[in-house]
Amino acid sequence: MLSRVVLSAAATAASSLKNAAFLGPGVLQATRTFHTGQPHLAPVPPLPEYGGKVRYGLIPEEFFQFLYPKTGVTGPYVLGTGLILYALSKEIYVISAETFTALSLIGVMVYGIKKYGPAVADFADKLNEQKLAQLEEAKQTSIQQIQNAIDMEKSQQALVQKRHYLFDVQRNNIAMALEVTYRERLYRVYKEVKNRLDYHIYVQNMMRQKEQEHMVNWVEKHVVQSISTQQEKETIAKCIADLKLLAKKAQAQPVM
């Protein structure tokens, strides 16, 4: 895994140096501007969670798989041993005191990795799981908030779609209020006209009654004035005679 990182970093550095022009000591001119390209709409493949397999902590497994069809199972080891012996025989690499120091350091590092590596890996995995759990919780919270916002928006859209019912209700209420006002005013006019007609009828009845009383009084007055004293005496005498006759008839009838 470490070799892949080193090789990729070296390839990136080489390509950047190849495409750059020297302006001065320690100064490079960039030939392209970063973060200005058009975004790709294709789906980005997910990054691997774990790295590829390596042998001896440095050599990728793909190197052995590449040489197996051509050299067999022992081919990569023979090739590596031959390269080491070639470098030593041609004095490309000379063994010195630093070589033993490097071997000692490498041995200590390998021992530390073998002994404490799993515990450190478990601790790192726990930290990673905690971070993933926090991110997942934040993601679920965000999804829930967005879902709530979507539900609220849908409810608001439903209310907006049904607002014409509110307009119809308000229109009907206004029509009913106008109808009630119209009927109240019509009843007020009816009462006013009825009161005026009743007043005129009362006035007419009063005038007719007064006219009748005046006529009766006038006739009675003239009748009384037309009766003489002799006629009055005769009438009184006739009334007394009639009363006496009625009294005799009443006495002649047996009492039941």
Swiss-Prot record:
Keywords: Acetylation, CF(0), Hydrogen ion transport, Ion transport, Membrane, Mitochondrion, Mitochondrion inner membrane, Transit peptide, Transport. The modification N6-acetyllysine is found at K139, K154, K162, K221, K233, K244. Residues 1-42 form a transit peptide. The modification N6-succinyllysine is found at K131. Pfam families: Mt_ATP-synt_B. GO terms for cellular component: mitochondrial inner membrane; proton-transporting ATP synthase complex. It is found in: Mitochondrion; Mitochondrion inner membrane. Belongs to the eukaryotic ATPase B chain family. PANTHER family: ATP SYNTHASE F(0) COMPLEX SUBUNIT B1, MITOCHONDRIAL, MITOCHONDRIAL ATP SYNTHASE B CHAIN. This is ATP synthase peripheral stalk subunit b, mitochondrial. It comes from Pongo abelii (Sumatran orangutan).
